[in-house]
């Protein structure tokens, strides 16, 4: 390791201090009226501990669960103010009452204090039966700091019971936050999927780009320009250590972890043109995957850890291609929507991908279904949607979206993402993979770019 590398690592670690920010809030903009109705009743507590709970300013468990289910796009949680009565136990449930409201699922819960811990219990009740039937229940004894995580865990359990799909409410996201801070304009941040518990991982006066989670959620790979040119960093989140620094001449960027966690794909221009490379993380050996005079970048892995989707301009404009890492002659185009297509992100089950489609002066997020060959636009109401990332369960995706103060988006499509004028803010958006549900995360103090969703195995 060179003296420069050691100094650089110390700089990164010094800037790693955990800076907390105000939480963001999800604002649903489209699709909630078509979702399945459900009621999450405020959790009850013993009268003798009510005062202690209030003074402790604990998280509102029921509100978090309701928000999670609503944010999935599959449930419409009935506002508490609309409930004529709030049952506290199973025997209080009157099925005919809920039937008139069009609700056949109700969540009841309670919170108590045991020693210095909190005991959270809940029941998921089917009100279409008479008498009402408990179809799921559980209890947790936890420390106060784990209240929000426990609420997300309950949401995951309820979501999977009702849909058969694993929930993603306990996952984390990472993104780059751009602010007006003169000293540190760029920050790599992580947060809960809903924007709460935001933490700064790294701050820099130079651009940070393209964060990517390891499959176990313990590391992030990202691009930094702290040294004056691009370098690729792999950083462990628990102890703040730098595991790898990839710093070849010219461009180093677009990292992507293989699903098995054994390899990292990225793009380099050390030979002039941008080409794809793979590092074996156990040996640090680097293998070149593409070797031509075109720009090949933005790799995304298929589930087998043997095939990559990537962006290439070998046909004249950026399109998405697929290549086998063991046979670089087996490369073929897989995107065909009008205009250009780039920045692919493959679903964890490998059945579809989302990508950025540029066409007629606008930029959308589009989807390609590998099973049917169908391509469709998911964000037709967006002007400059970018960098999509699919949720681990494959039913949602996040992306950055530019709010243009200038009415013409065409002025900016040929510019680099980091050069978009400061008066146009980039926000974090959330949408269902069928395009029917959309929401924005509001409350950030700056522009959010390059969002990426952790795997199901990632936790706090």
Swiss-Prot record:
Keyword Cell cycle annotated: yes
Q: Example GO biological process term?
A: protein import
| One Pfam family it belongs to | PD40
Q: Which residues form the signal peptide?
A: 1-22
Phylogenetic placement of the source organism: Bacteria, Pseudomonadati, Pseudomonadota, Gammaproteobacteria, Enterobacterales
Family (UniProt): Belongs to the TolB family.
Briefly state the protein's biological role. Part of the Tol-Pal system, which plays a role in outer membrane invagination during cell division and is important for maintaining outer membrane integrity. TolB occupies a key intermediary position in the Tol-Pal system because it communicates directly with both membrane-embedded components, Pal in the outer membrane and TolA in the inner membrane.
The protein's name is: Tol-Pal system protein TolB
Q: Its quaternary structure?
A: The Tol-Pal system is composed of five core proteins: the inner membrane proteins TolA, TolQ and TolR, the periplasmic protein TolB and the outer membrane protein Pal. They form a network linking the inner and outer membranes and the peptidoglycan layer.
Tell me where on the tree of life, at the top rank, the source sits. Answer: Bacteria
NCBIfam families documented for this protein = propeller_TolB
Keywords per UniProt:
Cell cycle, Cell division, Periplasm, Signal
Location comes to: Periplasm
Any one cellular-component term (Gene Ontology): periplasmic space
């Amino acid at each position: 390791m060179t003296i420069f590398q050691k100094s650089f690592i110390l700089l990164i670690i010094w800037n790693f201090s955990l800076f907390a920010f105000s939480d963001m809030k999800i604002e649903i903009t489209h699709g909630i009226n078509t979702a399945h109705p459900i009621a999450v009743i405020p959790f009850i507590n013993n009268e003798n501990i009510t005062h202690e709970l209030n003074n402790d300013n604990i998280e509102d468990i029921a509100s978090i669960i309701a928000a999670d289910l609503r944010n999935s796009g599959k449930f419409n949680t009935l506002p508490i103010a609309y409930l004529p009565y709030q049952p506290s136990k199973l025997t209080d449930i009157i099925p005919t009452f809920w039937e008139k409201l069009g609700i056949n699922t109700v969540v009841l819960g309670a919170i108590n204090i045991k020693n210095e811990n909190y005991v959270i219990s809940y029941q998921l009740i089917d009100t279409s039966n008479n008498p009402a039937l408990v179809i799921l229940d559980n209890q947790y004894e936890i420390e106060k700091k784990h209240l929000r995580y426990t609420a997300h865990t309950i949401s995951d359990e309820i979501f999977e019971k009702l849909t058969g799909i694993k929930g993603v409410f306990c996952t984390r996201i990472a993104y780059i936050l751009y602010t007006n801070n003169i000293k540190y304009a760029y920050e790599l941040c992580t947060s809960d999927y809903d924007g709460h518990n935001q933490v700064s991982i790294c701050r820099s006066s130079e651009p940070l780009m393209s964060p990517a989670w390891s499959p176990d959620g313990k590391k992030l790979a990202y691009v930094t320009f702290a040294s004056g040119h691009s370098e690729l960093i792999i950083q462990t989140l628990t102890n703040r250590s730098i595991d790898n620094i990839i710093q070849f001449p010219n461009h180093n960027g677009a990292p992507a972890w293989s699903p098995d966690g054994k390899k990292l794909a990225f793009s380099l221009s050390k030979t002039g043109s941008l080409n794809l490379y793979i590092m074996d993380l156990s040996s640090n050996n680097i293998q070149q995957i593409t070797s031509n005079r075109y720009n090949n970048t933005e790799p995304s892995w298929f589930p087998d850890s043997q095939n990559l989707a990537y962006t290439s301009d070998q046909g004249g404009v950026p399109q998405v291609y697929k290549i086998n890492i063991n046979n670089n002659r087996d490369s073929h185009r897989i995107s065909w929507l009008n205009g250009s297509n780039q920045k692919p992100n493959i679903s964890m089950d490998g059945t579809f991908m989302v990508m950025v489609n540029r066409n007629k002066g606008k930029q959308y997020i589009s989807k390609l279904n590998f099973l049917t060959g169908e391509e469709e636009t998911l964000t037709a109401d967006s002007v400059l949607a970018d960098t999509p990332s699919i949720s681990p369960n494959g039913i949602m995706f996040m992306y950055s979206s530019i709010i243009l103060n200038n009415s013409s988006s065409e002025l900016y499509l040929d510019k680099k993402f980091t050069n978009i004028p400061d008066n146009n803010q980039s926000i974090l958006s959330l949408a269902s993979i069928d395009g029917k549900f959309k929401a924005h995360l509001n409350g950030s103090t700056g522009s959010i770019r390059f969002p990426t969703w952790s795997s199901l195995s990632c936790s706090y």
